[in-house]
Amino acid sequence: KMYTTAAALCLLGPEYRYGTDFVTNGTLDNGILKGDLIIRGSGDPTWSERFYDSNYDSVMVCFVDSLKALGISEINGKIIGDDNVFDDLHWGAGWMWDDEYEWHYAELSGLSFNENYIDYTLIPDSSTIGNPVIIEPLLKTSYINLRNDMVTVGSKAEEDWRYGRNHSTNDCWFEGDYSIQSGVDEADLTIHNPTLFTAHVLKEYLLDAGIKVNGNPVDADDLIDSIDYEQTSILFTYISHPMSRVIAEANQPSSNHIAETLQKTLGNELGEGGTSKEGLKIQMAFYDSLGMDVENLYLRDGSGLSRYNLVSPSNSTSLLQVMWDHDYRDDFVKSFPIAGVIGSIDDRMMGSNAVGSVHAKTGNMTNVSSLSGYAWTKSGEPMIFSIMVNNHMTGNSKVKPLQDKIAIILSDME
């Protein structure tokens, strides 16, 4: 993510914003939109609760309010989602197929809502052992089919539960035994076909707001005839947060979805199309122009999920140095997690001089853990570091304290 966000920030600029057009192929007559409502996806990754104070509703309510402001009370047509700004490869090269239901493996699309997953709250009924666990989706939608075969048990020793989503469907399930001693917990599941999901959820919000919709949600790829945008008119355009905010949301909590979207955006804006392959061409040319050793840098996706990626501490420290000397240094450094303060290291290095002084990006997969960034010494001198631990058998929970000790040593220096 550090590599992708650096390229996106420098090549597109901190004030770059996505613009998504809501258009129609019909006319507006006395409050009735006689035609389809078409969402022409721009690849905007900001339509999620992470950009709106953990509020799922905000962005959809904004869309509904914009249509209401135009006087629309009824749509006599379909809700069409168009994701063709990007290709239809929903995963990065080398991603693990058996993790497709996990939120960090959510499908990629040129039109997405809430990073294409749904959070669920698990609430055990403690009144009677054997009762079903209450499972509440934070986003209530009929787009998914939920099967709940999970019941309560007494002790933690008896607990054994699992959840998932059937391949290439929206059939989600929870099953097993959940201990009442575990209390309230959370889980998340990805959805299939983000474009149709977005159109479906928008229709639900429109209906809830009293706007009648006579047609069904549709993925533009399923239309018999392609959309001729020269024969449409723009109803309104939704403008995203700026790039400076987008990269912060990619780096601090570590969002794979945002990073992958940025890579395809680079391909769409500066290459020959919205694909990861085109985005990578732009990225590698950018690193080469900065004098980095691109012969020994092997990237295959935008987020770092792929096992095909091969980078070294030397690559990473070179990038960190280049960005330190860049005009956009402040935006880049501010996008990083901060030890003991925010992001993926907000609970690490506690009680040490590293708290507030180490700004570093994490990178973790099974048997792989890295920490790269900037550490300020006691005298305020910035230092660049990169720690990578590969092919270990101890688990990342035992590797991270070692990384923390090294970062603390740097921050303790005079």
What are the residue ranges of the model-derived segments?
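Small-residue-rich helix-loop
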Residues: S58, H241, P253-N256, E260-E414
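Ser/Thr-centric signal marking residues that sit
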Residues: T4, T20, T362
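Active/ligand-binding-proximal structured segments within catalytic/core domains
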Residues: M2-A8
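Short alpha-helical basic/polar micro-motif
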Residues: Y3, H200, S314
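Short, conserved micro-motifs enriched in small and acidic residues
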Residues: M2, L189-L196, S306-L310, N396-S397
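Conserved serine DD-peptidase/penicillin-binding transpeptidase domain
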Residues: C10-V294, I409-M413
